[in-house]
């Protein structure tokens, strides 16, 4: 189980990313439209003035049950060992262990 503070920090980053998503996207589109270097620099300054935690690269996928940051399956939003436990106890419909 991840520390509660790390999980809360990740939730805060997700909120910030959603809040500034449209602004960040519009600034990046402007950069591609503008051809003058001086105008591009102004737009880059605006982009850099946004909060650092609002960048999508700062987000980390976490297991929604345990908060574990590694070995996550995107389809289920679960870490590997929780996914395995849920499949073994038949809590995930349609998921089966492979055998050949």
Curated annotation (Swiss-Prot):
UniProt-listed GO biological process terms: translation
Localization, UniProt: Plastid
A molecular function GO annotation: structural constituent of ribosome
Keyword Transferase: no
One cellular-component annotation, GO: plastid
Family annotation (Pfam families): Ribosomal_S14
Keywords: Plastid, Ribonucleoprotein, Ribosomal protein, RNA-binding, rRNA-binding
Major localization listed first in the record, in broad terms: plastid
Known partners and oligomeric status: Part of the 30S ribosomal subunit.
Function as written in the Swiss-Prot or TrEMBL entry: Binds 16S rRNA, required for the assembly of 30S particles.
Entry's family note: Belongs to the universal ribosomal protein uS14 family.
Protein name: Small ribosomal subunit protein uS14c
Organism of derivation: Cuscuta gronovii
Gene: rps14
């Amino acid at each position: 189980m991840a520390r509660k503070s790390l999980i809360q920090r990740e939730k805060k980053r997700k909120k910030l990313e959603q809040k500034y998503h449209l602004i960040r996207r519009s600034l990046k589109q402007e950069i591609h439209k503008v051809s003058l270097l001086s105008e591009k620099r102004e737009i880059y300054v605006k982009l850099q003035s946004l909060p650092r935690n609002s960048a999508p690269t700062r987000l980390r996928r976490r297991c929604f049950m345990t908060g574990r940051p590694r070995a996550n399956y995107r389809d289920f939003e679960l870490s590997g060992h929780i996914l395995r436990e849920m499949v073994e106890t038949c809590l995930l419909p349609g998921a089966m262990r492979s055998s050949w």
